[in-house]
Amino acid sequence: MSSSKINPAIQFYEGVDETAIPEIRLTRSKDGKTGQAIFVFQKPDALSEATTGDITGMTLIDDEGALKTREVKARFLNGEPSAIEATYTWKTESDFERFMRFAERYAKKNGLGYSSK
């Protein structure tokens, strides 16, 4: 990788950063090895009339590289797309740690905090 800093970003289309900030919920198995991060984007740019093409996945990008998932669904309200729900799944502790490093960078860039419910 180059020495330049890559701003942490989420993309539904390659090269186009999503500006809507998602709500993110984490779940983990009892042994802590597997789990999911569920992202919900209300009124994301990716669903605007200006965007064209199909959403085939979500990419989380930062200095370490990219994390990808194809598990992406649209939510509809009155027949119109209103939100995107995407699920990133990890299967090992190291995958979880990598995801958390991305999440911390993304949160810091966007002034977000963490709350336990």
Curated annotation (Swiss-Prot):
Alphabetized Gene3D superfamilies for the sequence: Photosystem II Psb28
GO CC annotation: photosystem II oxygen evolving complex; plasma membrane-derived thylakoid membrane
Entry-linked InterPro entries: Psb28_c1_sf, PSII_Psb28_class-1
Subunit note: Part of the photosystem II complex.
Family classification: Belongs to the Psb28 family.
Protein name: Photosystem II reaction center Psb28 protein
GO terms (BP aspect): photosynthesis
Key words, A-Z: Membrane, Photosynthesis, Photosystem II, Thylakoid
PANTHER family: PHOTOSYSTEM II REACTION CENTER PSB28 PROTEIN, CHLOROPLASTIC, PTHR34963
Superkingdom assignment: Bacteria
Location(s), subcellular: Cellular thylakoid membrane
Record membrane topology: Peripheral membrane protein
